[in-house]
Amino acid sequence: MASRPAASSPVEARAPVGGQEAGGPSAATQGEAAGAPLAHGHHVYCQRVNGVMVLSDKTPGSASYRISDNNFVQCGSNCTMIIDGDVVRGRPQDPGAAASPAPFVAVTNIGAGSDGGTAVVAFGGTPRRSAGTSTGTQTADVPTEALGGPPPPPRFTLGGGCCSCRDTRRRSAVFGGEGDPVGPAEFVSDDRSSDSDSDDSEDTDSETLSHASSDVSGGATYDDALDSDSSSDDSLQIDGPVCRPWSNDTAPLDVCPGTPGPGADAGGPSAVDPHAPTPEAGAGLAADPAVARDDAEGLSDPRPRLGTGTAYPVPLELTPENAEAVARFLGDAVNREPALMLEYFCRCAREETKRVPPRTFGSPPRLTEDDFGLLNYALVEMQRLCLDVPPVPPNAYMPYYLREYVTRLVNGFKPLVSRSARLYRILGVLVHLRIRTREASFEEWLRSKEVALDFGLTERLREHEAQLVILAQALDHYDCLIHSTPHTLVERGLQSALKYEEFYLKRFGGHYMESVFQMYTRIAGFLACRATRGMRHIALGREGSWWEMFKFFFHRLYDHQIVPSTPAMLNLGTRNYYTSSCYLVNPQATTNKATLRAITSNVSAILARNGGIGLCVQAFNDSGPGTASVMPALKVLDSLVAAHNKESARPTGACVYLEPWHTDVRAVLRMKGVLAGEEAQRCDNIFSALWMPDLFFKRLIRHLDGEKNVTWTLFDRDTSMSLADFHGEEFEKLYQHLEVMGFGEQIPIQELAYGIVRSAATTGSPFVMFKDAVNRHYIYDTQGAAIAGSNLCTEIVHPASKRSSGVCNLGSVNLARCVSRQTFDFGRLRDAVQACVLMVNIMIDSTLQPTPQCTRGNDNLRSMGIGMQGLHTACLKLGLDLESAEFQDLNKHIAEVMLLSAMKTSNALCVRGARPFNHFKRSMYRAGRFHWERFPDARPRYEGEWEMLRQSMMKHGLRNSQFVALMPTAASAQISDVSEGFAPLFTNLFSKVTRDGETLRPNTLLLKELERTFSGKRLLEVMDSLDAKQWSVAQALPCLEPTHPLRRFKTAFDYDQKLLIDLCADRAPYVDHSQSMTLYVTEKADGTLPASTLVRLLVHAYKRGLKTGMYYCKVRKATNSGVFGGDDNIVCMSCAL
């Protein structure tokens, strides 16, 4: 992918000019030799230099050049023309450099031919005066004769712009009409350099963040308000502002919608191309390219062109009367240019900014020039995609009507995002704009009873009002300048924006909504309030201030480098201090009455706080003739979960754990869905999990190897004695002794195995965990009091008893943000893990617990779960496949760095004076042993660091007992717009149907790769084929070469599941909790799924030593009717983050 020229070599990417290298003699010299005099020396080059040649027209008196390109179809209207002259070089000039008028460029003609196309590029200082153009924008004419006579009109236009693509395919009716000759520019362009969220450049966001707003009112900059902490080697080197600000004498909409601006990319994300450097504020403004095109073509357009100097018939004051008058003044022009009203809105907003007092917490929110500019950007981009955009209504300057207009746009165009990554981003921008229309003032937010901010946090925020106001202004401006950085928060995508709007942002005051800035201020501010002195030293290298710690957390949260769990996102900073995600309850109840008491008290209290629960019911084992079964108690639990979720905006759930020798195991396997025999036994709102001893799989393997009459024995409470309390060899000796004594009911082992896989394939559960592996690798010996269960999502390993419940607080790091220029940045990963460990320790210290048992579990072990999200996204950004040797090595490397960084940070807290967790002295850490040392195949690459940590750990201790837990990140991965957890993408086009309609979430990286590979009719055919094959590239394009880039875009169903199990096993030495590993299987062509498929996968997971053998089982139907993964009415939002 071509990138913007490096600051140190601005001519590096130029194509030859006039037969010379761009770094050679000036274009002025070449132009004179060709008889084409220029007022200034200008080099011209294309950002994508693949075969592009800029040639002198060699016409006496001409001020034009021709582009010769053998791959002009790929370049097309998105060819980023960059001028290297006195003002605009390969990068912005130093602020003190002398200014001169910037040239403009307009592509005026395209020639088609098998040997390449040509385009006339007209140069000028400022255009000649046209109707409606102010006297300040006059220029000398470009002689039509110099261009060899009037050229034919452009092949097609996009919203007033012109396109240079030769493609002659018919456009899909959904994008603009049956008779249009070509499709949307998105399908023609090469997104690699023009799209602001290109996969290779978005990793510069965190570096660009600190430079993004150098011209906020009052001289405030983002650097002043929030220093960037990134020190990556790939930081952009820029000498001036990233984007030219809209100064008081500069119209924000100089370029008509759909028309390329100076040096702009007609398919790019803004009127000013993000990759093309732009002149400093105050420099001569580039002319309207549409006027230049008229000059070059000799056309006479009677339509008035509205510029900075347009004289409106009413004052620059937004009132209903003035807005209606301007609408009448513009007349039919607003139908041709839907965003035309926005120029008036922008100029009025600019005038209002001059009148209003400086911003404070009490300042009422208002729509600013930046907000209208954001809307203009979105409308221009949609026009470039050939969408029929409705005009901006005259009353859209009012928040309510702007919200209605945005909703109309989003609902109307969201079905089309499956074909356009850019549209997916643009609709996300619009949703963020809709969120802004519901903002309240900071003062109203601080006082809100519904938000209920922590009192200490409120005081701190008031103490730092001036800094926070500057930061808010800087970020507002920064997010509106989305074309100044590859991938800002507002441009993460439609699903990300909707997730904020619908779930994470708090409602208050009837119709107000917490802003994204306020949400992250609440979280980061609270973390800064509760950070200890030791934490400040670790984070900042010195004690530091509250404001410095606030910046430390805010930057990493706002940039999605670290992501708190869902309870933390919703509750941190409020007086509702419940931030724990996972609870493990083992009431050890042996009777129906005791089990019901545990459910209605202990479990109900946790559900009331929206916690996800793993409940061990192994001890209640009285099923038999004339005795009670556990099923009536589970029916009560099922109803309790359903009742809690009915009124909850954040549904949760419970999972019951029992071992496979429990007499009720067969009933539990039949309690969900179509397998439930009678209604009294149906429990559709809870999950089940089997706590499998090694002995079961040893016998199952014997059966699979051909041994006959292999049996398994079920025991009740009276005969099972203490089987649940032992593991490993002790369990096997006791179990076999009971069999010899003749106790229990013997069944063929294949009968139970078949029941397990039948239930899993039909309902998605039971989940499967390996009891011996969990206990074998725990931090202390559990023989005689074996760990008996896990949490709702099977990734937490924690002891629980009648007196103490297991509790875990979660956070995750976004691995996709660690990819920098197709390189994985382990320094950034270490920084993110460190910040996440500090955040979770503050959560452990601050959180309330719903029961005394939970309080004991939280305080004694201080267990944390640091997870990951975006592993597959990072893999794709790096250009790798999960099957490649490079990725498999990276997979182990990432896991090791995460555990090492987490343990080093936890140890550093103890070095700084914090107490080790209460059970440290009985743990293996006291003896200097690590989790990975129990895995014979583990080969750590940081042996020196591990040895230093060992010595420090034995001397000072660890603040936490456990560290890494790889949970599903279903919710938070949506706001980050990355793949969930460590799993491959479930599908390349995710569809979610709600009462508001269907929302699609495409794999934008795949869409961009498709646009690089195909064009025209072939691209549309490929997308149709993907639709028919559930967006599986392997099925839709089976003829691709094995090394083709598109081969990387496999879904979870396309991968060999044994490979995914092996990847989990490779990470296992460095995952001291466990991993929520889902299995993805596909039916055979006849619609059947052999039981042996799942059985052999479970056996493989057992042999590889995993703790979790199967979280969900998801089955892809052979009939193209979708994917079944159990009951979709229950969604775990606790440890699913």
Swiss-Prot record:
Residues 131-141 have a biased composition (Polar residues). The record marks 1111-1112 as: Important for electron transfer. Residues 1-32, 124-159, 173-315 are annotated as: Disordered. Disulfide bonds join 582-808. It is an enzyme of class 1 (oxidoreductase). It catalyses: a 2'-deoxyribonucleoside 5'-diphosphate + [thioredoxin]-disulfide + H2O = a ribonucleoside 5'-diphosphate + [thioredoxin]-dithiol. GO terms for molecular function: ATP binding; ribonucleoside-diphosphate reductase activity, thioredoxin disulfide as acceptor. Residues 291-304 have a biased composition (Basic and acidic residues). It comes from the Viruses. A motif (RIP homotypic interaction motif (RHIM)) lies at residues 64-84. GO terms for biological process: deoxyribonucleotide biosynthetic process; DNA replication; release from viral latency; symbiont-mediated suppression of host apoptosis. Residues 281-290 have a biased composition (Low complexity). The RIP homotypic interaction motif/RHIM drives self-assembly into homomeric amyloid structures and mediates interaction with the RHIM motif of host proteins RIPK3 and ZBP1 to form heteromeric amyloid structures. This is Ribonucleoside-diphosphate reductase large subunit.
